[in-house]
């Protein structure tokens, strides 16, 4: 909900504000002033995050026969707790866990989150719904900008910087992007500046080596685009947003590990450094 206000500013301030208006990403004074106020008041990060932890982890068998991959440990701490660490680093403590496979074990382990310094709400799927379908279950809890993260990856992303890009570019969705030598196993983005002009899931011929790092900032309108039943953000939603010109990419240089199979899981166990700031290495495409 927005309210109209009237303010009086010094001419020099107005001149500085007008210089930031490009008619494309920043369309008027009101939008630029709102962004500047949000940044100065510290409301420069989403307040809620959704972690998608309902998958069966079939490529991690036999480890996931009795243990959900959300509870697999890397260096003595569950994968999910490492994600909590990233979110808590930036003051994000309201977390929704989208659960499915072996959900009772996840709920028993994490409870309401107080033991881990977070507040947990659960969105439960009775059958596999995909990354978009499970997100839709959390709709009633998501009124403003929010974060979504896959639950089977470790990542170190500068969330405030990513959110600033997201808001300044008036995006409906912003995807954190990392690079790999072989992008054919992932969602791949082609950028024009920060705008994702093409997004292809697991392409035979990749348009770049920038891949989806499984970490997003979304607006509630994205949930309204999700159809009932099984649906994937990567295949059903992101390509549409790219065509609309409302999908942005945030390349980052922090650590990222996909823990989707046994081999990658072992690599993460050896090389993950924890949530360490690498801000000076991150790319800021404003």
Regions found by a protein language model. Give the residues of each.
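Conserved N-terminal catalytic core of the sugar/cofactor nucleotidyltransferase
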Residues: 2-4, 11-26, 31, 35-51, ...
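Conserved beta-strand termini and adjacent loop/short-helix elements that scaffold enzyme active sites
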Residues: 123-125, 176, 250-252
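Residue-level signal for inorganic ion chemistry
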Residues: 80, 106, 138, 152, ...
